[in-house]
Amino acid sequence: MNLILFGPPAAGKGTQAKRLVEQRGFVQLSTGDMLRAARASGSELGQRVAKIMDEGGLVSDEIVIALIEEQLTVQAGAPGFIFDGFPRTIGQAEALDSLLESRESKVDLVIRMIVDDTRLLERVTKRFEEQGRADDNPATFSRRLERYYEDTAPLVPMYAERGVLVEIDGMGSIEAVSAEIDAALKQSA
C-alpha cells in the first residue's frame, strides 16, 4: 500500500505516520526528515537546503524526487510506504506516479488532514518552543503555510478525481485522528 498523508505544516502528519510505522510496519518517507538530515550534514546540498528552508521556500522537485527515489529503492521490500510531506506540487505528484508505475505500483490512498490556521499556529509555536526547529519560527511558518495553499492545495481535486482522497478532521486528539485514519485504511483495503 502506498499512502500519502497530506495537509498543511503542523497538521500532525509526522505524528500519524510514526504511529502507522509502529502498528503496520510501513516505511515512512518524510521529505521533511530527509531534508533536515541533508541540512544537518553540512554538505553543499545541505547548505542549499538550509538556505531554502530558512526562507520558508520549497526545495526543488529535482532534489526531493531524487531523495524519494533513493528511499524507494533502498526499502523495496516494505509492505507499504507512507509519503509524508510529498508530493507538494503537481510536478512532484506526476513524478511520484512515474516512480511508482516503474515499480508496478500506484498511490492507493491520500489522507488529507484538515486543521484550521489558528490551530496550526498554536501547534507550530509550541513545537518551536519545545524542539527549536528552525522552520517553525512564526515568520518562516507563515511563508510555509502560504506555499502550502499556493502549491500543494491544488493536489486535492486531482486526487479526488482519482477516487483515492479521504478527508479527515485533524483537530481532534491524536487518538481520534488515528481512529479516522484506521477507518479510511480499512475502507480502502
UniProtKB/Swiss-Prot annotation:
Q: What is its EC number?
A: 2.7.4.3
Q: Which residues bind AMP?
A: T31, R36, G57, L58, V59, G85, F86, P87, R88, Q92, R133, R144
Q: Which reaction does it catalyse?
A: AMP + ATP = 2 ADP
Example of a GO biological process term: AMP salvage
Q: Does the keyword Cytoplasm apply?
A: yes
List the GO molecular function terms: adenylate kinase activity; ATP binding
Keyword Cytoplasm found: yes
**Residues annotated as region LID?**
126-136
**SUPFAM superfamilies listed in its UniProt record:** P-loop containing nucleoside triphosphate hydrolases
What is one cellular component GO term in this UniProt entry? cytoplasm
Compartments, as annotated in UniProt: Cytoplasm
List UniProt keywords, sorted A-Z.
Answer: ATP-binding, Cytoplasm, Kinase, Nucleotide biosynthesis, Nucleotide-binding, Transferase
Record pathway: Purine metabolism; AMP biosynthesis via salvage pathway; AMP from ADP: step 1/1
Q: For this UniProt entry, what is the primary localization, expressed as one broad class?
A: cytoplasm
Pfam families xrefs: ADK
Q: Region labeled NMP — which residues?
A: 30-59
Q: Where does ATP bind?
A: A10, A11, G12, K13, G14, T15, R127, G172
**Matching InterPro entries, A to Z?**
Adenylat/UMP-CMP_kin, Adenylat_kinase_CS, P-loop_NTPase
Subunit organization: Monomer.
Functionally, this protein is described as follows: Catalyzes the reversible transfer of the terminal phosphate group between ATP and AMP. Plays an important role in cellular energy homeostasis and in adenine nucleotide metabolism.
Per the entry's comment, what about the domains?
A: Consists of three domains, a large central CORE domain and two small peripheral domains, NMPbind and LID, which undergo movements during catalysis. The LID domain closes over the site of phosphoryl transfer upon ATP binding. Assembling and dissambling the active center during each catalytic cycle provides an effective means to prevent ATP hydrolysis.
UniProt lists the family membership as follows: Belongs to the adenylate kinase family.
Q: What is this protein called?
A: Adenylate kinase
- What organism, scientifically named, is this protein from? Hyphomonas neptunium (strain ATCC 15444)
Please name the gene that encodes this protein.
Answer: adk
